[in-house]
Amino acid sequence: MEYNFREIEKKWQQRWVEEKTYQVTEDESKQKFYVLNMFPYPSGAGLHVGHPLGYIASDIYARYKRLRGFNVLNPMGYDAYGLPAEQYAIQTGQHPAITTKANIDRYREQLDKIGFSFDWSREIRTCEPEYYHWTQWAFQKMFNSYYCNDEQQARPIQELIDAFAIYGNEGLNAACSEELSFTAKEWKAKSEKEQQEILMNYRIAYLGETMVNWCQALGTVLANDEVIDGVSERGGFPVVQKKMRQWCLRVSAYAQRLLDGLDTIDWTESLKETQKNWIGRSEGAEVQFKVKDSDLEFTIFTTRADTMFGVTFMVLAPESDLVAQLTTPAQKAEVDAYLDRTKKRTERERIADRSVTGVFSGSYAINPFTGEAVPIWISDYVLAGYGTGAIMAVPAHDSRDYAFAKHFGLEIRPLVEGCDVSEESFDAKEGIVCNSPRPDVTPYCDLSLNGLTIKEAIEKTKQYVKEHNLGRVKVNYRLRDAIFSRQRYWGEPFPVYYKDGMPYMIDEDCLPLELPEVDKFLPTETGEPPLGHAKEWAWDTVNKCTVENEKIDNVTIFPLELNTMPGFAGSSAYYLRYMDPHNNKALVDPKVDEYWKNVDLYVGGTEHATGHLIYSRFWNKFLHDVGASVVEEPFQKLVNQGMIQGRSNFVYRIKDTHTFVSLNLKDQYEVTPLHVDVNIVSNDILDLEAFKAWRPEYAEAEFILEDGKYICGWAVEKMSKSMFNVVNPDMIVDKYGADTLRMYEMFLGPVEQSKPWDTNGIDGVHRFIRKFWSLFYSRTDEYLVKDEPATKEELKSLHKLIKKVTGDIEQFSYNTSVSAFMICVNELSNLKCNKKEILEQLVITLAPFAPHVCEELWDTLGHETSVCDAAWPAYNEEYLKEDTINYTISFNGKARFNMEFDADAASDAIQAAVLADERSQKWIEGKTPKKIIVVPKKIVNVVV
């Protein structure tokens, strides 16, 4: 019977659906294993061959674990909200829900063709109310919680309200936006609105004034990674920094727990290091500086308290509220012009750009350690969100301060004995402190650091700051709170209405608050977000439902929030929802959560290291605090798949002609290289007729060939439509079959490395599957499988494979597994092995990689159940023992020939046989060897 992959794959994909092969339920008799891919955003372009790489890798592992007896959860869904669908809606007027559904249908069709073991009964779509019900629920929980620093967990906000009524906020140690101080009497005297403003200072989900990347053309706030060189990634529209009142999540409260949790999970060290740097823990001191000739004072944070005597200027972030307070009238015009320029740069660009810019505020600060008045400057190398948004500048010992001082001619005062700061700053934290205070100046305070090591000086200064009420010792984190508002339509609506300008949550039993219909997807004429177009977007607090906006009376009917949630909202807890996707009473049933706990294997790209992978860890820790998740860490092991790059092809057109010259002849002409569609090229040979039909301008093309062929050039580039190197997996499946695609993607190289897509090798993988098939069927359709005992050689070949593939799968070394399969099938073919006991175990071992053909052959072997329900074969070391060993025979250390010996041959017997071999006589030359060294199972060296 011929290997007809089209019929086989269609048959088994249908059978898997009918028999619910991949549906899974909790089973206490089995150990669980949860496999998860980062779910895709369904774009209009569909999948190209790079997208399934991680899905195939995780699917192989999921199938393998099932064969090992685990109860495997392997779900799939769609991250369906997002800006691309909304932009398409703006351009075409078509509702995002329509395009999103069409895109999802296309993705599902493509995914089904590849033969994944997804449990589609658990499919989720973040844009469906049944799903975002629980995103809204989690947001409400965050709004109604604060973070207790003493207990290191989220607690109900009602506890704060009760405490404020008795104690005020005396002794409170909670994460907050700013330090407040009030008594119980003062709390009780405040209006409801004033109390709500105070509570907003502590809530985990809160409204706050933040600097954002604002894109007027898109009418929305953009995340840093959505802005490139001052313009939006999508559309290339100008982006400026703007202060807006936005919903935020107090992610910073969880900074230390996010750091500590990294020690408990199996992620790569490089990715852990990326997160550690992003969280950015630093120990230091906050020190207060008074403004000269003013009652104002401000606080800076420093990790180098030892450098207080070297402060020669101060720098404020352009966004700091202090800028307006400290800018003198004489400097106002210059400062305003500078602020306008900095608005056009994102924080990420400011961090990356080392060029020096700044402006003097006109004010001075008093150094509390020297009494000196130092100028206060404004510069965009200082960021408002880190520390206090103000720094003390010590140019002798900080490279950015040094560059600034050199540029503006400010004093540079070294504080370490023997350091040379004539060309660059001395940033090392080693050496002996000097000039602290300077010997030629009368000391302003009774602190001296001279003669101490830097480490000693840091600790002594921190203690001095604490004892003299100049500030406090503090641990600081670079991690910012997450901005959680977007001025878009296609996102989760906030379950929030506004009363007297303050936000209130709609009742929990009224969730989900569904996204309303609008007829326009751009901001309103008055600048409101697109939800401002909704005609029924007011909340009736009596009837608990949405009503027409015209009914708003601000007594019982109030306006609803017009912003929507950002893209990461729906992806921050989706792994929990997969466990119990149809539960309308809870995010996940506690018993179900207790069984699945967290994701055992998570597969996705490294580009999410400081976005999704931070937010989801934070979100899960919060849910753990409120009892909605049994474990703190959502993803136990993380594997980052590499990128499959495009392999572009080129044709070479002779200048000013319609003639194209083949690759190895092009140097004889003046040519222009042009990208050509890789789908009309095979093994770098161009299909000439297909090329002529590809584009009208090539219809009359002529060719200069070599050996009767047109050979194309090639290069590795990003896979993109503009380079005509996008390969659709459907085309590969149609031509070679899904099993070939699956195995070939793994064969390209290690899962975690990036590699180019190259169809030149795919024929070899397809031939391998046909050769595997030929162990079962002859070319004349004869069924070859026999129930006969296997030979020693056949068992050795099989068990060598089982051992290799078992180890490879555990290590995600799938490329070497594919090579091992090829070697084994070649060996069995040469041995003319058609033994059932060999082929049965071979089918099971190959099944995770090529499930369709293995299901078919498993069925022909007489099994009534799926190969998925078989047991993974164990290798037997007895079969792997070598009967003979090939020894290298050397004379005076130089290899001359090889000899075979029994594996258990004694050293004396080996020596005698070597000396007796006629080939040895040439090298011994009649002499008596001084000694013979036998390295067991490797080499024999005769010393003459």
Curated annotation (Swiss-Prot):
<keyword id="KW-0963">Cytoplasm</keyword>
<dbReference type="GO" id="GO:0006429">
    <property type="term" value="P:leucyl-tRNA aminoacylation"/>
</dbReference>
<keyword id="KW-0436">Ligase</keyword>
<feature type="short sequence motif" description="'HIGH' region">
    <location>
        <begin position="40"/>
        <end position="51"/>
    </location>
</feature>
<keyword id="KW-0547">Nucleotide-binding</keyword>
<dbReference type="Pfam" id="PF09334">
    <property type="entry name" value="tRNA-synt_1g"/>
</dbReference>
<dbReference type="InterPro" id="IPR025709">
    <property type="entry name" value="Leu_tRNA-synth_edit"/>
</dbReference>
<keyword id="KW-0030">Aminoacyl-tRNA synthetase</keyword>
<dbReference type="Pfam" id="PF13603">
    <property type="entry name" value="tRNA-synt_1_2"/>
</dbReference>
<dbReference type="GO" id="GO:0005829">
    <property type="term" value="C:cytosol"/>
</dbReference>
<dbReference type="GO" id="GO:0005524">
    <property type="term" value="F:ATP binding"/>
</dbReference>
<dbReference type="InterPro" id="IPR013155">
    <property type="entry name" value="M/V/L/I-tRNA-synth_anticd-bd"/>
</dbReference>
<dbReference type="InterPro" id="IPR002302">
    <property type="entry name" value="Leu-tRNA-ligase"/>
</dbReference>
<keyword id="KW-0648">Protein biosynthesis</keyword>
<dbReference type="GO" id="GO:0004823">
    <property type="term" value="F:leucine-tRNA ligase activity"/>
</dbReference>
<dbReference type="InterPro" id="IPR014729">
    <property type="entry name" value="Rossmann-like_a/b/a_fold"/>
</dbReference>
<dbReference type="InterPro" id="IPR009080">
    <property type="entry name" value="tRNAsynth_Ia_anticodon-bd"/>
</dbReference>
<dbReference type="InterPro" id="IPR009008">
    <property type="entry name" value="Val/Leu/Ile-tRNA-synth_edit"/>
</dbReference>
<dbReference type="InterPro" id="IPR015413">
    <property type="entry name" value="Methionyl/Leucyl_tRNA_Synth"/>
</dbReference>
<protein>
    <recommendedName>
        <fullName>Leucine--tRNA ligase</fullName>
        <ecNumber>6.1.1.4</ecNumber>
    </recommendedName>
</protein>
<dbReference type="GO" id="GO:0002161">
    <property type="term" value="F:aminoacyl-tRNA deacylase activity"/>
</dbReference>
<keyword id="KW-0067">ATP-binding</keyword>
<dbReference type="InterPro" id="IPR001412">
    <property type="entry name" value="aa-tRNA-synth_I_CS"/>
</dbReference>
<feature type="short sequence motif" description="'KMSKS' region">
    <location>
        <begin position="718"/>
        <end position="722"/>
    </location>
</feature>
<feature type="binding site">
    <location>
        <position position="721"/>
    </location>
    <ligand>
        <name>ATP</name>
    </ligand>
</feature>
<comment type="similarity">
    <text>Belongs to the class-I aminoacyl-tRNA synthetase family.</text>
</comment>
<dbReference type="Pfam" id="PF08264">
    <property type="entry name" value="Anticodon_1"/>
</dbReference>
